[in-house]
């Protein structure tokens, strides 16, 4: 790598760093992605087996929109790479009578047209008989949410970015582990 120049250096090959480098590469830039331990290593927050992707973030429409966009990007990556990166398991919010946050989540999901369903305590026990509704006022079901296979996803993303860079003629684009 000595003597190479890059348009951008991205520090950290976790979820945010990997996506940043990936999008810069797609934009035709020469990118160096640095991480002390490599993409999605066990010390990184993106290095675990799974992370929840959900749409509900209270009244925060911006974060909810970002979550939708993020999920679409992960699904597109899975399609390109032929790997199973996301498991659509749904997200179930269990709420008490005083839970204003869940009500805000529901309002935001409704406003943005995101599929969701409110369940009474009785409906909850019928739909999910393994859950006791004792102390639960109502539940909110987000069927489109689920689990992202975090480590595999970030590693697939970095590999996909490098593939795209090489096909675009960027032989110098790389991932490096700094030498102490």
Q: Which ranges hold each PLM region?
A:
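Beta1/beta-strand and adjacent pyrophosphate-binding region of the FAD-binding site
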Residues: 2-16, 32
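Short beta-strand/turn micro-motifs composed of small residues
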Residues: 12, 35, 95
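Gly/Ala-rich phosphate-binding loop of Rossmann-like dinucleotide-binding domains
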Residues: 21, 25, 160
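Glycine-rich FAD pyrophosphate-binding loop
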Residues: 25-46
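Short, flexible, mixed-charge acidic loops at enzyme active sites
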Residues: 43-50, 131
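Dinucleotide-binding Rossmann-like beta1-alpha1 core, especially the glycine-rich loop
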Residues: 50-127, 136-137
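Flavin (FAD/FMN) cofactor-binding and adjacent substrate-gating region
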Residues: 96-170, 175-179
């Amino acid at each position: 790598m000595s003597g190479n120049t890059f348009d951008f250096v991205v520090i950290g090959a976790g979820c945010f760093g990997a996506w940043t480098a990936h999008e810069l590469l797609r934009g035709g830039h020469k990118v160096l992605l640095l991480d002390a331990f490599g993409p999605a290593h066990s010390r990184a927050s993106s290095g675990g087996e799974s992370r929840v992707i959900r749409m509900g973030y209270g009244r925060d429409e911006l974060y909810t929109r970002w979550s939708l966009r993020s999920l679409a990007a992960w699904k597109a990556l899975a399609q390109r790479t032929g790997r199973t990166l996301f498991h659509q398991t749904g997200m179930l919010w269990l709420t008490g009578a005083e839970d204003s946050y869940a009500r805000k989540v529901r309002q935001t999901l409704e406003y943005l047209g995101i599929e969701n369903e409110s369940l009474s305590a009785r409906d909850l026990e019928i739909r999910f008989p393994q859950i006791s509704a004792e102390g639960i006022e109502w539940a909110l079901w987000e069927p489109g949410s689920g689990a992202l296979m975090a480590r595999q996803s970030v590693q697939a993303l970095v590999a996909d970015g490098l593939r795209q860079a090489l096909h675009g003629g960027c032989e110098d684009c790389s991932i490096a582990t700094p030498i102490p």
